[in-house]
C-alpha cells in the first residue's frame, strides 16, 4: 500500500525550485535501492537513531523537507505501534502543500518558517495560502527549523 505522506514546495529564495511529494510504503526485506547520480547521489537503509546521530554530528546533510518528513514518519510509526498499523491509519491523511519561508536570524543562522507558524503571514515572500487549521500531524511538528547560514 502506497500512502501519500507530504507535499513540499521549494521557497522562492532557492535558485532551484521543486514541487515535491513524499510517499510511505512497505518494501520487500531484500529490496535493493539505486540512485540516479543526479538528484540522488547516495542512499542508505538506516535506523532513526543512526540518522539522528549522523545529522547531529554533521556527517550527513539533509534538506529541510526530507528531515521534517522523516520526523513525521517516525512520530507516526511510534504513535501507531508499527509500519502496517501506521500505513493503515494514515491512508486518508490530509496533505496540504507546505511552502516554507526564510526568516533571518543573524550572521550565522537562518530559520525556515512553516505555514502553521503564527508569524508566517508577516514574513515577506511568496508563501502559500494558509489554511484555517492544519492537520494534527503537522501541528505536532515544530513550525521553525534553524540551520547554519551557507556561505
Positions of the model-derived regions?
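Short helix/loop capping segments that flank catalytic or ligand/cofactor-binding pockets
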Residues: 13, 32-34, 121-123
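Short, surface-exposed linear patches
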Residues: 26, 45-48, 66-68, 134-137
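Generic detection of long, well-ordered alpha-helical segments
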Residues: 59-67
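Core RNA-modification/binding signature centered on pseudouridine synthases
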Residues: 64, 71-73, 78-151
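Intrinsic disorder/low-complexity segments enriched in polar/charged and small flexible residues
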Residues: 7-10, 47, 76, 118
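NUDIX/MutT-family hydrolases
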Residues: 1-8, 20-27, 33-60
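Active-site segment of metal-dependent pyrophosphate-handling enzymes
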Residues: 1-31, 66-69, 90-101
